[in-house]
């Protein structure tokens, strides 16, 4: 009893002078929310960037799922890492007689980290939130107490983890993807093995997640009181239960869905629906390209030389299926200048007459584009190509715009891979698109548009745009000497960065369906781990600020309050909804092409690495883990599938973030110490 009275008196005496620092506490809460906002805007792409980029979920769905799992993860897993950020980097005992200086340092650290992360988010540059807060914490400590205030041994461990985390995550992702590819993807019929593996994948995901929560993730909820055998038993039991649910309910439903997709042949698919508007006996009047070349000059092909009884084909999307490297050059669909070589039938709305005698019915929007520009292209899409796989699960679901946009009214987005990707598929002319948008965002459009005829400088593009640049070539009227130009051959593609080698190892449509929900699950797992690890970046200094003000003890043993973790989780969610789209577009596409199977391997292995690090109290970067996994899996698929220039820039940013945030924090701390507090 005497000890309790003594400690209470000491706390009261210590907290008395700190009432004067209430303004600093309020300022700290405001800056902490801004910091959490910046964390959500920048780092959330690590969790759902690949899922949104591959079209598995829309941006709105990703925001909803991430809001739930980020918040839950921040509450259940965030306390452990907050302790490391709060007391592991600096010697807080040196601030026993200068609590106000430690509070000012916490505000300075949050300010320095928030400013740099907001700038990086505005520039769509993915950086590490952990790097920011570590550098900012060291920056204010150097100003306040000099080199003696920093635990350099702990800093060395953290710096080592920055290199170890992408390496470990990359190795784990590579091993997992190698097993998936060997036992599922490379099988003649991957569906049986994939269905057998589903319960295992779900069980591992759920079991690991529950174990991380109960082992050390949520001490305030009482999970830390469970014995080790109890934690293992509960985790294994829940994992087995989940596996049974998946085996008896999910697998049969998935099998039926895949069978329906397989039975639906490509020609019967709504994606390439073809309707014959005339009777079958009129099909004999169709002319082949070879007949036209032999009997008539191509430039004279028109309504006068082609019978009007030709079959009118209505295609939702203008492309043809072909087998990889099997279609002879003469059978490839030509690139046509509609102003010179074809005629638009006035009797049929939007019907275009091709050199082979067929009339192709286009939608009103496409017809307007044809009439205004006169350019429209057909492309052969090979069944084994990555473009074909992407078509099946994007265009077939009619959500190309929804994947990265808000509604179907705006299916084409400027300055991202979907714009060039969709326009290349549909053969839409880029000239009109450039004319409308080039004046406003000329610099951004350089990443999107093809080079002009007079310029031979190759413009760097992302992987999707490079691939479309390889399979399509927009010709102007002055460049066309002949009426029909054959599509680029495979030999011409091999010399470009958009080589088909990047797309050789692609998921089959049924495999994509198999892994789509798994990728969503692993994205949720990654979001949960991200919330547990990165909420400490925003709340760690705020916890130190609040506990010093509340208890007057710089080395308080009080556990991190749950409501503070929840406060940080809410800030992360707000940042995700407002600015999350910017970095998601960068991380979800540009580093390497992602398929559902590779995305599953990337997300599960990187999330497992982050969760393990969170439970041992080591603040690692989720950005590093995800980048390491993406590069590892992309390198296994094809060395050319990785944008090594972008990887180099990201790697350089890892070193720049720490000193920049540290300098900003040190400057603010100097103002506090020498101008405001005069301590």
Curated annotation (Swiss-Prot):
It is found in: Cell membrane. Its main location: membrane. It is a multi-pass membrane protein. InterPro entries: Phos_transporter. Optimum pH is 6.5 and 7.5. Changing residue 550 to K: Drastic reduction of virus infectibility, but conserved virus binding ability. One of its GO terms (cellular component) is membrane. It comes from the Eukaryota. It catalyses: 2 Na(+)(out) + phosphate(out) = 2 Na(+)(in) + phosphate(in). Keywords: Cell membrane, Host-virus interaction, Membrane, Phosphate transport, Phosphoprotein, Receptor, Symport, Transmembrane, Transmembrane helix, Transport. Residues 550-558 are annotated as: A. Pfam families: PHO4. The chain crosses the membrane at residues 21-41, 62-82, 100-120, 158-178, 203-223, 230-250, 511-531, 558-578, 600-620, 650-670. Changing residue 128 to A: Loss of sodium-dependent phosphate transporter activity. Able to restore cell proliferation in SLC20A1-deficient HeLa cells to a level identical to that observed in their wild-type counterpart. Ubiquitously expressed. Induction: By phosphate deprivation as well as by IL8/interleukin-8 in hypertrophic chondrocytes. The modification Phosphoserine is found at residues 265, 269. GO terms for biological process: biomineral tissue development; cell population proliferation; monoatomic ion transport; phosphate ion transmembrane transport; phosphate-containing compound metabolic process; positive regulation of canonical NF-kappaB signal transduction. GO terms for molecular function: high-affinity phosphate:sodium symporter activity; phosphate transmembrane transporter activity; signaling receptor activity; sodium:phosphate symporter activity. Sodium-phosphate symporter which preferentially transports the monovalent form of phosphate with a stoichiometry of two sodium ions per phosphate ion. May play a role in extracellular matrix and cartilage calcification as well as in vascular calcification. Essential for cell proliferation but this function is independent of its phosphate transporter activity. (Microbial infection) May function as a retroviral receptor as it confers human cells susceptibility to infection to Gibbon Ape Leukemia Virus (GaLV), Simian sarcoma-associated virus (SSAV) and Feline leukemia virus subgroup B (FeLV-B) as well as 10A1 murine leukemia virus (10A1 MLV). Region A confers human cells susceptibility to infection by Gibbon Ape Leukemia Virus (GaLV) and Feline leukemia virus subgroup B (FeLV-B). Substitution of Human SLC20A1 region A by region A of murine SLC20A1 prevents viral infection. Belongs to the inorganic phosphate transporter (PiT) (TC 2.A.20) family. This is Sodium-dependent phosphate transporter 1. It comes from Homo sapiens.
């Amino acid at each position: 009893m005497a000890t309790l009275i003594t400690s209470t008196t000491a706390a009261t005496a210590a907290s008395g002078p700190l009432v004067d620092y209430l303004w600093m506490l309020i300022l700290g809460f405001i800056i902490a929310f801004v910091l959490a906002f910046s964390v959500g805007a920048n780092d959330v792409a690590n969790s759902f960037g690949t899922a949104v980029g591959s079209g598995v979920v829309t941006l709105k769905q990703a925001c909803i799922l991430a809001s739930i799992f980020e918040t839950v993860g921040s509450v259940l897993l965030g306390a452990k890492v907050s302790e490391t950020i709060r007391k592991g980097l600096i010697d807080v005992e040196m601030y026993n007689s200068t609590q106000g200086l430690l509070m000012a340092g916490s505000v300075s650290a949050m300010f320095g980290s928030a400013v740099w992360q907001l700038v990086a988010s505005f520039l769509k540059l993915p950086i590490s939130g952990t790097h920011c807060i570590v550098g900012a914490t060291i920056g204010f400590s150097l100003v306040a107490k000099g080199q003696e205030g920093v635990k350099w041994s702990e800093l060395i461990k953290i710096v080592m983890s920055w290199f170890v985390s992408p390496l470990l995550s990359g190795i784990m992702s590579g091993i997992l993807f190698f097993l998936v590819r060997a036992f599922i993807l490379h099988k003649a019929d991957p569906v049986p093995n994939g269905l057998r593996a589903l319960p295992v994948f779900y069980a591992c995901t759920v079991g690991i997640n529950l174990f991380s929560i109960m082992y050390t993730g949520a001490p305030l909820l009482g999970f830390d009181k469970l014995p080790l055998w109890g934690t293992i038993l509960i985790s294994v039991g829940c994992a087995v239960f989940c596996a049974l649910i998946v085996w008896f309910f999910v697998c049969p439903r998935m099998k039926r869905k895949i069978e329906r997709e397989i039975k639906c042949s490509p020609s019967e698919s709504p994606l390439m629906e073809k309707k014959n508007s005339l009777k079958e006996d009129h099909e004999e009047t169709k002319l082949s390209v070879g007949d036209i070349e032999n009997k008539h000059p191509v430039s004279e092909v028109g309504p006068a030389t082609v019978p009007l009884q030709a079959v009118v084909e209505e295609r939702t999307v203008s492309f043809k299926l072909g087998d990889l490297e099997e279609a002879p050059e003469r059978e490839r669909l030509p690139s046509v200048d509609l102003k010179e070589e074809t005629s638009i039938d006035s009797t049929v709305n939007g019907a275009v007459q091709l050199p082979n005698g067929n009339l192709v019915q286009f939608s009103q929007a496409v017809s307007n584009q044809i009439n205004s520009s006169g350019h429209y292209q057909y492309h052969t899409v090979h069944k084994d190509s990555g473009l074909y796989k992407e078509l099946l699960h994007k265009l077939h679901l009619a959500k190309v715009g929804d994947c990265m946009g808000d509604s179907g009214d705006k299916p084409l987005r400027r300055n991202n891979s979907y714009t060039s990707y969709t326009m290349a598929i549909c053969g839409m002319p880029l000239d009109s698109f450039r004319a409308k948008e080039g004046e406003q965002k000329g610099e951004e459009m350089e990443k999107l548009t093809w080079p002009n005829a007079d310029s031979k400088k190759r413009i760097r593009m992302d992987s999707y745009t490079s691939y479309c640049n390889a399979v399509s070539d927009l010709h102007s009227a002055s460049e066309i000497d002949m009426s029909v130009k054959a599509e680029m051959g495979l030999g011409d593609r091999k010399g470009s960065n958009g080589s088909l080698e990047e797309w050789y190892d692609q998921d089959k449509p049924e495999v994509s369906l198999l892994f789509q929900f798994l990728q969503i699950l692993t994205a949720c797992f990654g979001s949960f781990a991200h919330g547990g690890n990165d909420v400490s970046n925003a709340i760690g200094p705020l916890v130190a600020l609040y506990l010093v003000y509340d208890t007057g003890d710089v080395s308080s043993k009080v556990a991190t309050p749950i409501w503070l973790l929840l406060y940080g989780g809410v800030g992360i969610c707000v940042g995700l909804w407002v600015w999350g789209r910017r970095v998601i577009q960068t991380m979800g596409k540009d580093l390497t092409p992602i398929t559902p199977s590779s995305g599953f391997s990337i997300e599960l292995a990187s999330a497992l690495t982050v969760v393990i690090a969170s439970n041992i109290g080591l603040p690692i970067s989720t950005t590093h883990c995800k980048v390491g996994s993406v590069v590892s899996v992309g390198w296994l698929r094809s060395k050319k599938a990785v944008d090594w220039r972008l990887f180099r820039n990201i790697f350089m940013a890892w070193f720049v973030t720490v000193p920049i945030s540290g300098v900003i924090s040190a400057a603010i701390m100097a103002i506090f110490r020498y101008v405001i507090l005069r301590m």
